Amino acid sequence: MKTPHGRAGINSVFGVPGPEGSTWYKQNITTVKLPFPIVYENDDETLDEVTRCRFHVKVAPNLIAALNAIWYHARVEVKKEVGYDKTTEEYDTLTYKWLKDKGLLNYGGTFNYRKIRGSENLSLHSYGIAIDMAPGLN
């Protein structure tokens, strides 16, 4: 898929979004099983583990590929730090901890039909093509 440019390009590729329950939503938004759990911080600062999210069907595979690349990079860094003599289970635990310690498991959301704050334009979250990862770091 060629990367769209501008709102017209985005609408052309992903359609004009609608709220949850709309025909557009039913045809374009899918629930994605994440390759590893991430953490959503609620407004009251409690944390919820997230294992699935809603994303546009056209780019859901790209989301999984990006998250797998993050996991793979973290795994390589962990192996550099602790060596190459651990079990897969031990590496999984250490990789998750490595990501958590760096704030890279924190998640702010995906599909959310809403306008950009201070604007009349819809957020890219309305299309299901945006994810907020490590929102406290950016």
Whereabouts are the PLM-identified features?
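Auxiliary tRNA-acceptor-end handling modules of aminoacyl-tRNA synthetases
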Residues: 1, 45, 104-109
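N-terminal low-complexity, Pro/Thr/Ser-rich intrinsically disordered segments
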Residues: 1-17
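Homeobox/homeodomain signature
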Residues: 4, 24, 101, 121-123
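Active-site acidic/histidine clusters and adjacent loop/turn architecture
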Residues: 14-103
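Aromatic-residue hotspot detector
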Residues: 29, 105, 109-114
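Flexible, surface-exposed loop/gating regions in the mature catalytic domains
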Residues: 98-103, 126, 135-137
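Short, surface-exposed glycine/acidic/tryptophan-bearing loops
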Residues: 110-135
